[in-house]
Each structure stands twice: as C-alpha cells, then as structure tokens.
Amino acid sequence: MSSARDVVFPAGRQALYERHRYSPAVRANGLLFVSGQVGSRPDGSPEPELEAQVRLAFQNLNAVLAAAGASFADVIDVTIFIVDPASKFERIWQLVLAEFWGEAPHPTATAIGVTWLYGFDFEIKVVAKLPEAAA
C-alpha cells in the first residue's frame, strides 16, 4: 500500500505551498480535499479589504479546483471560517450567495467563528466529488 499523496497544485502557487509545507489539495477515492483557501496575494500577504479578500479566496479556491479538473459545482461540503462573524457574516454571506454559490442543489455548509486567521478575515475549505475524467 502506497502512502504517497496525490497532491494537486494550482499554477503559479507551488512555491507558496512549499514554503508553508502543506498541500493545497489531495485526491483520494474520487474526492478532492482542499485545504483552507484565504484571500492571499501571490506573495502570500492578505488582501486588506474584506470583500476583495473573500473574492480572492474564491479565486484561489477555483484555481485549486480547476487544477484537479473540477469546479465549484462539484463541491459537496464547505466549511468557512470568519474572524468576528457577528460583524462580518452577513456581508460575507450575501457576497458569497450573489457571486459564487450557484444554483441548487447546494453543498452542505458550516460557518465557524474564529479569533485569528493569520491576518486574514475569511477562509474556505471544501470537499469536492471529482468528475469521472478527473478522478
């Protein structure tokens, strides 16, 4: 039994993941497990404005999904982390619904309030069912 992980790297960001020593996504048994994606610029720094940070987190997520031959339509489970959700959740959720969520059936979703995300305000991690051709 091989212990090698089938890691997926989006184009242009491998050095960032290697520096922080984690995999952006791992394929296993027809599923794609995507690490938490934040609104980080190419150098890893946070996008300062909240809405821009959420959009960039989704761009980064979509790049990982695309590198595996998937899209957000293949996502079956979503976990989002929000710093200070009492003041930010509604603004973030309305943006997510309007720009990224898509049509029903929707993935399962869990939102978790946290106190710290290494300078970020929003993080999203997902599990996707890979299309047959990408599995």
Give residue spans per PLM region.
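N-terminal presequence-like segments and the immediate start of the first folded domain
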Residues: 1-59, 63-76, 82-135
